[in-house]
């Protein structure tokens, strides 16, 4: 006897039931309030926040996010936070869990206000843990004490993620190593030896394989810069995203066998944009998001992206996977009568100048060659016509020096005919970037590229959307996109045009009557160009050698 086979109708009914169950689960997750908890300076839980008046927490791509929490003055957590002398530690920490994402930060200030009606409220202000990266210096030699810093600068070349992580790790280890500095509590013997174990550090990072890192190469050079300042241009150039996670009780191990202390902040650098590979950068609603690869045109100035064939994206094959793959963005926020966009602001700035001028000082060696030629000619003339003991070359050079100095090979001008044709017959003409006072050098070439980039067209799109209409915001499989992901938005007046940019800011805010997300897509301050990256790497290498005293 054969087993009964499942009919097509039963299969379809099962798929429908599973889909509806998933929809109900996601709807329930979206309506769940955020889990807000306050912790003291040693990461002891002080309480779960409820009954707040309002709250707002912001994620900013590769920069410090801010948070505010307003509580009634009679709230027990408000009294605890405002009474700075009674609590054991001065610092107050906060964690906010919503849709798979965790916002964590440290209190930067507290204010007690009295309103016109006599009510008092306490406002707590926080900075997220991206701020910590602005307080970590990259020493010239992290393994030696401050009195002995040889070589002069910390220099490292390699893939961007690996190089930045190694620079961060060495200086985290320096901060926790008690060989040359006192621990926080010198009387605690365990702090003299236990800090060699990264699980006990307040800040750590995920490891990175050198051979497995395919991010763009860079030159890291620092002489006591902050890690944030050191990393900012490299992160912007490669469109990488710094993330952090705060380990709390009940969380899974960050990686197998690693159990950090409660409250440890773990940093990572990830590529969520796919900018230097092939990714979505534009398109229309009829053909979808076009996948393109960056290409530098023959004139060395203009850039274009070439359309490439759509590859297979294995991440989207699983029916339970939720998110955006870096190489295949797919989320499209459309304007219209029935839309999840509650308000939006689209900003476009056209390109300005069609020619960039740099210079002011002659190329190295030019003034010296002219000076030597004048002195040689003067010496030969005086020896021939006056006598061998008469030397007029130096006199002539001194008199003529104000006339010839910085006149030959002192300026460079480069025009983009393509930009001129795109802008039309009437347009702005010339632009001179800052810090470009010497022509025909690596710095001048870099300044030209920076000039083109500073005057190119810019696109920014700020939207406020209703969560779950139809896309959800969240991380770690709880949302369709999050900070750093590339998503598309429709042009408000050109109905069929798609603008694809990175999510640069996320703002989660609520009060006693509303809840919502603000999304900022794109930025009017753009990253470096392709050739600028190459020149900056060479220039960084030269600067590193100069700091080391080699050049």
Language-model segments: what does each one mean?
Residues 2-166:
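Beta-strand-rich assembly/attachment modules of structural machines
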Residues 37, 91-97, 102-106, 241-245, ...:
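Ordered hydrophobic segments in well-structured contexts
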Residues 53-85, 229, 278-281, 287-551:
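An acidic/polar, Gly/Ser/Thr-rich interaction patch typically located in mid-to-C-terminal regions
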Residues 56-65, 110-122, 246-251, 255-263, ...:
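Short, ordered beta-strand-loop transition motifs
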Residues 100, 119, 220-228, 359, ...:
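Solvent-exposed, acidic/flexible segments
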Residues 114-119, 125-127, 262-264, 268-281, ...:
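Compact beta-rich and alpha/beta scaffold cores in large eukaryotic transport/transcription complexes
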Residues 122, 238-240, 263-265, 483, ...:
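Residues that flank catalytic or metal-binding motifs in active/ligand-binding sites
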Residues 136-317:
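Charged- and aromatic-enriched interaction segments used to assemble
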